Structures are given as structure tokens and as C-alpha cells.
Design a protein with these regions (language model features):
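Surface-exposed helix-capping loop/turn segments at secondary-structure junctions
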Residues: 25-31, 113-121, 160
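Extreme N-terminal tail/first-helix region
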Residues: 1-17
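Long, hydrophobic N-terminal alpha-helical segment
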Residues: 12-44
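Active-site rim elements
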Residues: 5-6, 92-98, 139-140
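Short, flexible active-site loop motifs that bind/organize anionic cofactors or intermediates
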Residues: 21, 35, 87, 110, ...
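Structural signal for well-ordered, non-membrane alpha-helices
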Residues: 16-24, 53-57, 61, 102-116, ...
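Short, contiguous alpha-helical
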Residues: 32-80, 123-160
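Acidic/histidine-rich alpha-helical segments that form the ligand environment
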Residues: 80-122
């Protein structure tokens, strides 16, 4: 059965299309505004979200295939990686961010849509300082929730 994965894929597709529409509408001035939640520019926040899509899809694939965990990887380490990403991509452009988003979204959509309900229930270690997560939980948090979180912050920052 693929009813759950089909539903998750449709939710993801809708959220991804909405995110692209918002990113495309941002002005140059909007792109440089700083979000209250992340304390990054709107552009860096959008780039962070875009870059995470393919990474999360890869972790979901690892969980469902039973691949060993990535070793010692904590939530604090992720926070450090995100802070470094913000510095490295401070000058990111809307065009490169949209291209990254579309590439990552296509990968994530294909992964989610290709799963069956048994695979969604498989669990694995995502962070060594947190309980294991199922593939479905990671999709809900790391894809759907991540889009909601950062696009909500962007919308609030630019007044949409």
C-alpha cells in the first residue's frame, strides 16, 4: 500500500509549489531583510531550506534501506552546520536558491512518493542525542515541517 506516502507526497508537492511562488515574488529588498526566528537574511533562510530538502531525502532513504547511522551526529552539530552554512551563503542569489530548491524538491518528492506504508514505519537514528525516528516522522518534521517553519518565518518577515 502507498496511500500514506501518496498523501505525504501530495502535501509536499503543494508546500513546495507554494514556497517557490513566494520565493519568486520576493523583492531584492525582501531578500536582504533579517528574519526574527533564524536571525538570517530571507535569502539565507530560503537557501538553507532549499539545501536541506535533498539531504533529508537522503536520510529517509537510509532509514528505509536499513543503512547504518551516520555515526555520532547530534542536534548541536546540525546547529553548527546551519550557522556555517549561513556564513558561507550570505551572498546567495534568488536564482541559485530557486534552482537548489527545485532540484531538492524533485528528489524529495520522488523519494516520498516511492515509499510504501511499511517503509514509512521503518525507524533509524537521525541524531545520536534523540530517540530514533520513523521515515514518516522524518518526512513530517524534516520536509513538511521544515518548509512550514522557514516559509512562515520568511512570510512574516516580508509581511505576506
Amino acid at each position: 500500500m502507498r496511500a500514506k506516502s501518496e498523501g505525504l507526497a501530495k502535501q509536499f508537492e503543494t508546500k513546495a509549489q507554494e514556497a517557490v511562488a513566494v520565493i519568486e515574488m520576493l523583492s531584492d529588498a525582501d531578500w536582504k531583510k533579517v528574519t526574527a526566528a533564524e536571525r538570517w537574511t530571507v535569502g539565507v533562510t530560503a537557501h538553507h531550506l532549499s539545501g536541506g530538502l535533498e539531504a533529508v531525502a537522503g536520510i529517509v532513504t537510509g532509514i528505509v534501506s536499513g543503512a547504518p547511522s551516520r555515526g555520532n551526529f547530534t542536534r548541536a552539530m546540525l546547529d553548527e552546520m546551519n550557522a556555517q552554512h549561513a556564513k558561507e551563503h550570505a551572498g546567495c542569489t534568488r536564482a541559485e536558491t530557486l534552482a537548489l530548491f527545485q532540484k531538492g524538491a524533485a528528489t524529495a518528492f520522488a523519494v516520498v512518493r516511492g515509499l510504501n506504508d511499511d517503509q514509512l514505519a521503518k525507524s533509524g537514528t537521525v541524531f545520536t542525542d534523540a530517540p530514533p525516528m520513523t521515515a514518516e516522522q522524518l518526512i513530517m518534521l524534516g520536509l513538511l515541517g521544515h518548509i512550514d517553519e522557514h516559509m512562515g518565518s520568511i512570510r512574516k518577515t516580508v509581511g505576506m
